[in-house]
Amino acid sequence: MGFQFSDRSQELQLRITKFLDDHIYPAEEIYAQQMQEFTEQGDRWQIPQIIEDKKKIAKEEGLWNLFLPENPMGESMSNLDYAPLAELMGRSGIASEIFNCSAPDTGNMEVLARYANEEQQERWLKPLLEGEIRSAFAMTEPAVASSDATNICSS
């Protein structure tokens, strides 16, 4: 099946590949070291400085929040055009956070962008889009043993 990616998607594929080579792959060992230090200190749940440093560069280079089909912070992108970008980002365990394209934040930002009122967007969406906070997704329901939201039975 042949898909034709937009010029923008093709350009971003090149830019992301370069960013991975220049910034992310070299940062993976530093990330592992910083995480090991946190673990040894008994406080693993910190954000390593290397992640924050690379997030700043990604944002400056316009490689930020690319997943949003209707991006309030910039240009929009179709799922078809985003797919090869996600594939590239998936080559590193730290890339999605650096590009602010990590689950569950991506899905939660899409929901907030589409359905939240202005106050909710100000409180939750904007800090998520800026990479200042993280989000979570949780569901529970009697007689449904799964973390797959499509299995929800209540209406």
Protein language model regions, located:
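Amphipathic, small/basic residue-rich leader segments at the start of a protein or domain
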Residues: M1-N100, E119-P127, R134
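Short, solvent-exposed polar/charged micro-motifs at secondary-structure junctions
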Residues: E40-G42, M77, M109-E110, S146-T150
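Glycine-centered flexibility motif
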Residues: P48, G90, P104-G107, A145-S146
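A generic signature of intrinsically disordered, low-complexity regions enriched in glycine/proline
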Residues: P69, L85, M109-L112, I152
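Short, glycine/charge-rich beta-strand/loop segments that flank catalytic centers
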Residues: N71, F99-N108, L129, M139-P142
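Glycine-rich, Trp-frequent "lid" loop and neighboring beta-strands that shape
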Residues: E75, Y115-S155
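N-terminal glycine-rich flavin-associated loop
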Residues: F99-E119, D148
